[in-house]
């Protein structure tokens, strides 16, 4: 059975953590992501410069947030800036398997092997290896792939996982974030630069 094609729509926007501050309280009130998006678009709550860009951003935001459980959405509402970034990183990894695979197979693997440098060429090599079995990667234009790579590394920096000089930074997960990530099977801690024993300490 062939693998489900990678979604490749994360060409801009970063983590959308600031935008999540707007959307999640609305969801707590209405409990319907379609209504959340409609309210955001109707009142331009994301303060987009154009209607079309606002709609694109709200669609992307809702698609990512909809991967979170009710408890996780409530956590985002009450989160610190760091916690919100971590939850939005988890949401991006869930929404986009390519991001999740890169996080687990490249970033976390490098971190665990004490190889602390993560650079754009690592993403290029990762994509080339996946393209052997993924036709959608083989057919993606160089321009689109550059946009994907640029936005992925923007997300990594916004989440605090990669420094400006390309070094992987250990993720200091809070207790409650570690708890919700570890509650999934398999654990979503696999998407973070943290060793399991550290995550276990945070979860207690």
Regions found by a protein language model. Name each.
Residues 12-16, 31-33, 94-100, 126-130:
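Helix-boundary capping/turn motifs
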Residues 138-204:
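Accessory, usually C-terminal, subdomains that scaffold auxiliary metal cofactors
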Residues 119-135:
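DNA-recognition alpha helix
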Residues 20, 99-100, 120, 149:
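Short, leucine-enriched amphipathic alpha-helices that occur as contiguous helical runs
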Residues 29-31, 115-118:
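Short capping segments at the starts of secondary-structure elements
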Residues 87-90, 94-117:
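Positively charged, polyanion-binding regions of nucleic-acid-associated proteins
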Residues 1-86:
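Eukaryotic partner-binding/assembly regions in large regulatory complexes
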Residues 9, 17, 26, 97-98, ...:
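Leucine-rich, amphipathic alpha-helical/linker segments
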């Amino acid at each position: 059975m062939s693998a489900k094609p990678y979604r490749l729509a994360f060409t801009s926007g970063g983590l959308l953590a600031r935008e999540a501050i707007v959307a999640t309280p609305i969801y707590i009130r209405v409990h319907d992501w379609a209504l959340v998006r409609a309210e955001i678009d109707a009142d331009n709550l994301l303060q987009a410069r154009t209607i079309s860009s606002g709609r694109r951003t709200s669609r992307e935001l809702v698609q990512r947030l909809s991967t979170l459980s009710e408890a996780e959405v409530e956590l985002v509402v009450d989160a610190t800036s760091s916690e919100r970034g971590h939850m939005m990183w988890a949401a991006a990894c869930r929404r986009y398997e390519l991001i999740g695979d890169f996080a687990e197979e490249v970033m976390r693997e490098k971190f665990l092997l004490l190889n602390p440098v993560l650079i754009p060429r690592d993403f290029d090599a990762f994509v080339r290896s996946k393209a052997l079995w993924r036709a959608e990667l083989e057919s993606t234009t160089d321009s689109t792939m550059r946009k994907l790579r640029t936005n992925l590394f923007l997300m990594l920096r916004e989440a605090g996982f990669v420094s400006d000089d390309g070094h992987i930074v250990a993720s200091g997960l809070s207790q409650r974030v570690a708890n919700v990530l570890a509650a999934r099977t398999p654990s979503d801690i696999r998407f973070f630069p943290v060793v399991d024993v550290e995550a276990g300490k945070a979860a207690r």
